[in-house]
């Protein structure tokens, strides 16, 4: 019997395109990061469900899809067969959506959010594409 080492404990075995896309989400880590958003909302003096849901969507777009697509673009750690142009689109379009949601949140809420949105957009690209070779 031949066994191959999986790229991650949660990665489904290769064999179909949909598994590549599910693996790309890194579901345990995506849910872990989304839980931080929920925990942050839970310790706030009052919960604004609309803000929580939009923030969850923004983090899912930026981290769950965007960051993981850029990471796969940079070295294929999961070994998916997702075409490079698709990974570029999955990396930048959801990230742009998250930045737009963050900017809209700043307009509706407080402008103090903008530095965090800008830094988040920058660090997702820089870290996942390894722009400083580290």
Predicted regions and their residues:
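Helix-coil boundary and interhelical linker segments in multi-pass alpha-helical membrane proteins
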Residues: 38-57, 99-115
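Aspartate-rich (DDxxD/NDxxD/DxxxD) Mg2+/diphosphate-binding motifs
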Residues: 9-11, 21, 58, 62-97
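Short, Lys/Arg-rich, polar N-terminal cytosolic tail immediately upstream
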Residues: 1-22
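Transmembrane helix-loop junctions in multipass membrane proteins, especially transporters and channels
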Residues: 45-49, 71, 75-79, 110, ...
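Membrane-embedded alpha-helical segments that form the functional core of polytopic membrane enzymes
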Residues: 47-69, 113-126
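Intramembrane alpha-helical segments
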Residues: 83-134
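The first (N-terminal) embedded transmembrane alpha-helix
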Residues: 22-43
């Amino acid at each position: 019997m031949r066994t191959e080492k999986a790229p991650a404990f949660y990665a489904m075995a290769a064999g179909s395109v949909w598994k590549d896309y599910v693996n790309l989400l890194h579901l345990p880590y995506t849910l872990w990061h989304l839980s931080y958003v929920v925990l942050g909302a839970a310790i706030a003096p009052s919960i604004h469900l609309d803000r929580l849901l939009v923030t969850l969507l923004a983090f899912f777009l930026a981290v769950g899809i965007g960051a993981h697509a850029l990471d796969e673009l940079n070295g294929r750690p999961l070994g998916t067969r997702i075409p490079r142009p698709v990974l570029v689109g999955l990396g930048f379009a959801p990230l742009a959506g998250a930045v737009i949601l963050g900017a809209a949140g700043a307009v509706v809420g407080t402008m103090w959010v903008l530095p965090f949105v800008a830094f988040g957009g920058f660090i997702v690209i820089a870290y996942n594409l390894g722009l400083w070779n580290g």
